[in-house]
Amino acid sequence: MTEEIRELIEKFALQNAVKYRSAPNHGAVMGKLMGERPDLRPRAREIAPLITSVLNEIERMSPEQWESRLREMAPELIEEISARKEPAKGLQPLEGAEGGVVMRFAPNPNGPPTLGSARGIIINSEYVKMYGGKFILRFDDTDPVNKRPMIEAYDWYIEDCKWLGAEPHEIVAASQRVEKYYEVAEELIRRGGAYVCLCEQTAFKALKDAAMPCPHRDQTVDENMALWNKMLDGSFQEGEAVLRVKTDIKHKDPAMRDWAGFRIVTKSHPLVGERYRVWPLLDFESAVEDHLLGVTHILRGKDLIDSERRQRYLYDHMGWVYPRVLHWGRVKIFQFGAFSTSKLRKAIEAGEYSGWDDPRLPTVRAMRRRGITAEALRKFMIDLGVGETDISISMDSIYAENRRIVDPIANRRFFVWDPVEIEIKGEVPEVAEAPLHPTIDRGTRRIRAGGRLLLCKEDVAGLAPGSRIRLKDLCNIEIKEIFPLRAELIDLSPETAKRLKLRIIHWAPVEGIPVRVLGPDKTDTGIGEHGISDELDRIVQFERYGFVRIDSVGEEVVAYFAHR
């Protein structure tokens, strides 16, 4: 009975692994088993350790071995995966897009692009590719205090846009166009749509909350223009004057009432220094830029609906037509939780992270350094589409997409972490010939071998005197002693391993190259085959470990972990 259950578990686990091209999920396997065999539900506690045992074995296999084993055990489950229809994915048509669109991605450059930024970059640029037109990268960088720009981040955004396949047709920095906002502000004053408010902040808030106008609201155009010029010439200090956009002072939402469009900031700006002392707030700057740049469609978070409502007052005053707007919900990534660029910046400055490309961070730079491809991010974000529902996703989904892309092109290499030396009695070949790829003929690699090799400590833990195993692409051995670890050669034949159903483990030469793998959760050190040093800046698969990108080669190889 136990053997029958074990076989069912193995089939369902392999199906889960093949479907998602990642290590099988314990909960999914348990759910499938209980769904197919409800009679086993009372035994769930007893079965759980059995599932864990089977999953541990499957995790040691390659994706190619998963599929081969599943075809052998249950080909109908392969067909079930193939036949299952995928839900509709991709970008839905844009209304009013015929004839071309102008779309923008408008970050504050206070840090490099994150995965959230990548979504905006990719989706906006993809719509431009669909309909023709212009994709604009606009830096909304007019807050030198609360969201102070990083001078390096401007170039980082441009680099990452290009890497993501979204090279902008035009690049604009709002901080270099402040005179244009001054022109609009003055026209707005002339039209009676704005006034200079001299109220203290607390006094204005009390009036606003009571839906009462401040005493400056009814100033004449000339009075407002004179006060505006005093803001510009330095007569007022920070906090003494703001330019407000007239709205409905009785609006049911206090946030809509006479919002601030400009304020005085004397702090130097990283890009333009002290050229300006009166800066537009984001709602004003963004609204004006969308008009000046001829933006036709805006993608923005549904949490910014209030910004749109405020901006429409400005558009109405100026007689402009507001662009079409699509709202989307938040995307939360399990592995990273809630994060903000400003908090990450402080953590980096405090030494908690090595930099913006630290493998633990959700930045595009970190993804690239780990070996996550631009193609995988594009495909994933496009499939995610545009919808108002908040969604939670796992990095496993991005990893699965990346695995599909890199698996055919990644050479295979041996890396032994936590190495333990084994001495083998017999004529073990001095050099092993192993394929660079298990299913695509790209030739072979030569690996130093001989009678002294290294095995992973976790593999050794499962051995005992009398255990028989196959060292991948080398030979079959029988363990004779554990302390010290010694074995005897059986033969070299893969057929023997098949006939005896030997467990297959990888190995590394004793005189191999030191390797350090940096990952989101841990750092592993060990020894790898010398050929790893030929893979600089490439994505490879360390067999039975996972996909990595080789970051540097010297006295040791430094690799960044991508995923299994």
Swiss-Prot record:
Descriptive protein name: Glutamate--tRNA ligase
UniProtKB keywords: Aminoacyl-tRNA synthetase, ATP-binding, Cytoplasm, Ligase, Nucleotide-binding, Protein biosynthesis
An example Gene Ontology biological process: amide biosynthetic process
Family membership noted in the UniProt record: Belongs to the class-I aminoacyl-tRNA synthetase family. Glutamate--tRNA ligase type 2 subfamily.
Protein species of origin: Methanothrix thermoacetophila (strain DSM 6194 / JCM 14653 / NBRC 101360 / PT) (Methanosaeta thermophila)
NCBIfam families registered for this protein in UniProt: gltX_arch, PRK04156.1
SUPFAM superfamilies given in the database record: Nucleotidylyl transferase (SSF52374), Ribosomal protein L25-like (SSF50715)
Top-rank taxon: Archaea
